[in-house]
Design a protein with these regions (language model features):
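Conserved, mostly hydrophobic/aromatic
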Residues: 85
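Conserved beta-strand-loop surface patch within small alpha/beta domains used
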Residues: 1-82, 91-141
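Metallo-beta-lactamase
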Residues: 88
């Protein structure tokens, strides 16, 4: 059992955070989405890969399956893996919605949400395991 005083974390380089913010600002008012790639089982995001939101919605996102497959294959060919998924909340807090929780496919992934509700974008990360949400600290490298 993990130490409850130690919060989980994900390391996201400032350049990657900049890419995420730029995508979210470009796509608003629609939600944006993409994948974080790093070493398998790692909590260090080395890359961000934007995906098309096939839902074309202000309130939900659906990753284009072709983008997902392309990014996953490319990562695997280079000995890397998808370690997290990113999407934006354009008008709400950066906290997982019931839909986000219900559709969380991998308990090992980080679920990163950038909120655009306020003047300054706010990026937060979570783990979603068996419907339970726990926040992870984002460490900018």
């Amino acid at each position: 059992m993990s130490n409850s005083n130690q919060q989980a974390q994900i390391v996201i380089p400032s350049s990657v955070l900049g890419q995420i913010t730029a995508l979210a600002m470009t796509e608003t008012p629609l939600e944006c989405c993409g994948f974080l790639v790093g070493d398998f089982g790692s909590d260090i995001a080395q890359e961000f890969h934007p995906c098309r939101n096939t839902a074309q919605s202000k309130i939900i996102y659906t990753v284009d399956p072709k983008d997902h497959l392309r990014i996953e294959r490319d990562a695997e060919e280079r000995g890397l893996a998808i370690i997290g998924v990113l999407h934006s909340h354009t008008h709400t807090e950066p906290y997982p919605s019931p839909t986000d929780v219900a559709q969380a496919p991998d308990p090992a992934w980080h679920y990163v949400i950038i909120g655009l509700k306020r003047a300054e974008p706010e990026t937060r990360s979570y783990r979603i395991i068996d419907g339970e949400i726990s926040e992870s600290q984002i460490v900018s490298a």
